[in-house]
């Protein structure tokens, strides 16, 4: 099927537009310690691997799967958010090279941009403030009431509705994880692209069904603009 004109780009944050450099894993270590997971050994290794495998998903959903009970999951999530926000306060958050310019270029060419995350809305807002990105995109979205995180399609479909794209065939999505790709495929978007700036590699992204794999968000913007 020939793609229709892209009207909306839905773009992930950590690993896609924001450098990760181990920040998510470091914050997870604090969360695991907070709920009593031994600091070394097979239990810790299994939990760490699960976090790596589920990169891109809603963090509270990851902790529910890991720790079972809601109380432990909420405790772990709160510790994760505190640790990640502390890393932001220490100046550890930085944009991926060219991300600001790529997003601005898309918008200058009439393409709306939504920034999405698996973090809470509070952490997302803090990250945006640290980067000076409060007005960079048309919309920012995080999982919450009535909006499930990845791999569900809710973030993409919510962006489509709020930014009034004509259909999913007018939407392109970009992320660095297999969860991003699964979410985009479930939403039925025209372009479900993976980027090599984050958690998962070319083979993992293609095996997940990515329609395109690009080197960075700069290449993603070029892909969209070349196919208008």
Language-model region placement:
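Acidic, Mg2+-coordinating phosphoryl-transfer loop and its flanking beta/alpha structural elements
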Residues: 172-212
């Amino acid at each position: 099927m020939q793609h229709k004109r892209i009207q909306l780009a839905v773009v992930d944050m950590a690993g896609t537009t924001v450098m990760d450099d181990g920040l998510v894993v470091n914050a997870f270590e604090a969360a695991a310690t907070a709920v009593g997971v031994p600091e070394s050994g097979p239990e810790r290794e299994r939990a760490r691997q699960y976090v790596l495998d589920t990169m891109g998903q809603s963090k509270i959903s990851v902790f529910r799967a890991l720790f079972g009970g809601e109380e432990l999951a909420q405790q772990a999530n709160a510790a994760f958010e505190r640790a990640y926000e502390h890393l932001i306060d220490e100046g550890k958050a930085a944009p991926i090279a060219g991300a600001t310019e790529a997003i601005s270029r898309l918008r200058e060419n009439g393409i709306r941009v939504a920034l999405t995350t698996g973090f809470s809305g509070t952490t997302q807002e803090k990250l945006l403030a640290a980067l000076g990105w409060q007005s960079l995109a048309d919309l920012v979205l995080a999982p919450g009431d009535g909006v499930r995180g990845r791999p569900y399609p809710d973030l993409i479909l919510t962006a489509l509705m709020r930014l009034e794209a004509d259909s999913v065939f007018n939407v392109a999505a970009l992320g660095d994880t297999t969860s991003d790709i699964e979410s985009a495929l479930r939403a039925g978007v025209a372009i479900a692209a993976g980027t090599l700036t984050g958690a998962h590699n070319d083979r993992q992204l293609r095996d997940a069904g990515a329609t395109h794999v690009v080197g960075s968000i700069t290449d993603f913007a070029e892909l969209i603009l070349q196919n208008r």
